[in-house]
C-alpha cells in the first residue's frame, strides 16, 4: 500500500484518509481523489462499517462525536472499534482533536449501550429513552484538552492503518536522507525478491525473466549480494533475543519514505 500511495502522489492523485462521514467499505473515488476505505482500519469489522454507513444514509451525516454515536446501532459496534477509528483519523470530520475524542468516547458508548438495553423494542432513540441525563450527555461539548503532537498523531495513524496517509514523520528529513543513503527500502526489498525468484527459477530449470517490474529489475542489476550499502530511516520496531552462543541479537524494522526493511544486528 505505501508504494501505491506514493505512486498516486507521483501522478498527482491525492489519497484521502478514512472518514466515517465519507468512506465506504473499500477504497473509493471522490472528486478525482482516492478515499481510504473503512475496512482498512484495524479492529473495525464489517458489521460495524455497515452500521456506520446505514446510520449516515438513514439519519444524515453526523455533525459531531455525540451525534455520531447516538445515531449508531450500538449493538453492532464496540468501544475498540470507535477508539481505532479515532486514532486512524476517521473521526477528524467530527472534531480534529483526537485527544478530546478519546477522552469522551467510552462514556458515550456506555450511555448508548445502557439506553439500548432499556429499549427492549429497539425503536426509540437514546434521547427518547434516556431522558434529560442522556440528552445532556450527547449535547455536551468536547473537553478542552491539549491536542496530541504531530508525531503522536501520525504514530496512531500508522498503528491503525499500517501506513501513513496524512503525512510522514521523515518527510522533513527527506533531503538529508537522500544525501547520505545509497539505497532505499524499496530497492532493497526488490533485490531480495529478485534473488529469491532467480533461485526458484534455477531450481525449476527456467530463468523466469519478465516477472519483475522495471524498478525491481533496475534494483537487482545495481545491488549485489554482499555489497555495502547505506539506508537512512527510523526504527519502527525492534525484537531482541539471545543466541545459542549467549550473544545479543536484534531484528530491527528500519523504515524510510519508501517502505520497511528488516535489519539484523
Regions found by a protein language model. Give the residues of each.
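Noncatalytic, beta-rich nucleic-acid-contacting surfaces in large DNA/RNA-processing enzymes
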Residues: 1-265
Amino acid at each position: 500500500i505505501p508504494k501505491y500511495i506514493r505512486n498516486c502522489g507521483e501522478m498527482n492523485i491525492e489519497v484521502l484518509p478514512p472518514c466515517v462521514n465519507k468512506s465506504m467499505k473499500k477504497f473509493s473515488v471522490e472528486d478525482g481523489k482516492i478515499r481510504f476505505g473503512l475496512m482498512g482500519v484495524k479492529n473495525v469489522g464489517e458489521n460495524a462499517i455497515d452500521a456506520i454507513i446505514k446510520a449516515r444514509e438513514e439519519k444524515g451525516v453526523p455533525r459531531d462525536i455525540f451525534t455520531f454515536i447516538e445515531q449508531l446501532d450500538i449493538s453492532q459496534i464496540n468501544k475498540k472499534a470507535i477508539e481505532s477509528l479515532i486514532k486512524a483519523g476517521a473521526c477528524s470530520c467530527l472534531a480534529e482533536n483526537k485527544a478530546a475524542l478519546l477522552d469522551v468516547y467510552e462514556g458515550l458508548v456506555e450511555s448508548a449501550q445502557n439506553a439500548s438495553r432499556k429499549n427492549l423494542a429497539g425503536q426509540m432513540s437514546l434521547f427518547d429513552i434516556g431522558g434529560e441525563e442522556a440528552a445532556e450527555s450527547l449535547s455536551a461539548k468536547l473537553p478542552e484538552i491539549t491536542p496530541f503532537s504531530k508525531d503522536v498523531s501520525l504514530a496512531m495513524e500508522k498503528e491503525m492503518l499500517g501506513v501513513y496517509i496524512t503525512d510522514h514523520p521523515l518527510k522533513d528529513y527527506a533531503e538529508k536522507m537522500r544525501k547520505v543513503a545509497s539505497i532505499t527500502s524499496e530497492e532493497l526489498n526488490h533485490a531480495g525478491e529478485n534473488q529469491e525468484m532467480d533461485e526458484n527459477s534455477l531450481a525449476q530449470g527456467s530463468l523466469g525473466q519478465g516477472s519483475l517490474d522495471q524498478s525491481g529489475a533496475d534494483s537487482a542489476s545495481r545491488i549485489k549480494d554482499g555489497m555495502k550499502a547505506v539506508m537512512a530511516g527510523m526504527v519502527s520496531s525492534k525484537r531482541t533475543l539471545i543466541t545459542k552462543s549467549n550473544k545479543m541479537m536484534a531484528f530491527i524494522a528500519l523504515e524510510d519514505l519508501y517502505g520497511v526493511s528488516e535489519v539484523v544486528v
